[in-house]
Amino acid sequence: MKNSQCGRSMIEMLGVLAIIAVLSVGGIAGYSKAMEKWKINKAVEEYTMMITGLLEYTENLNKNYSEQNKYIANFISQAKLVPDTWKIINSLYIDDSFGNRLLPYIGKHSLTVDFYIMHDNNRQTSNFAYQLCMALALDVAYPVLINIDTGGLFINNDALPNNKSYTVYRSSCYESDGTKVKCISEINNADISKICKSCISRSRCNVGITWQ
């Protein structure tokens, strides 16, 4: 009888431990998901802060354009358009709070920020890259570019035919040479999701935002 009770107690204990293990895994997964969501929201907040600030400086930056001063990573840092957690890599690149790399530069009549979303072993997961690509298009680029006549959004898209590498959206719906492209006003969750899936298979995914 005692042996039977002992065996039953051991089985019950193992069952309890199994339940605890499952709950622990679920808790860790839930925490990871919540942390990833927090990072996305934080990145969107910081990107929006930077772009909103750059919009105020665009005209002056374009006036002072030259090949020698086309890259503006140092300017962005000195103008306090980004948090102190961002790091200047060199005159070309600046890294955000989560290790994603940005290349901001000006032209004679434009300002562009290229976002390189990283998800190698030292940075984020491929799902984070996908989610951040989505957020960049829907929560950062769209609210800004929908109100700008000359805005553009470029996203890596491995699924495109004819060796094209980017899906292009323009506020005007046309490139400067008259080529018809997607309209900023037509941006929607389903299309952006399909495009941003390219980020899952890449160690570095590129999203570009430009305006005049």
Show where each model-derived region lies.
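A general marker of short, structured functional hotspots
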Residues: 27, 43, 53, 89, ...
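N-terminal single-pass transmembrane signal-anchor helix
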Residues: 1-35, 43
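Membrane-proximal N-terminal amphipathic helix
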Residues: 29-65
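Short, glycine/small-hydrophobic-rich surface segments
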Residues: 54-90
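Intrinsically disordered, low-complexity regions enriched in Pro/Ser/Thr/Gly and acidic residues
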Residues: 86-212
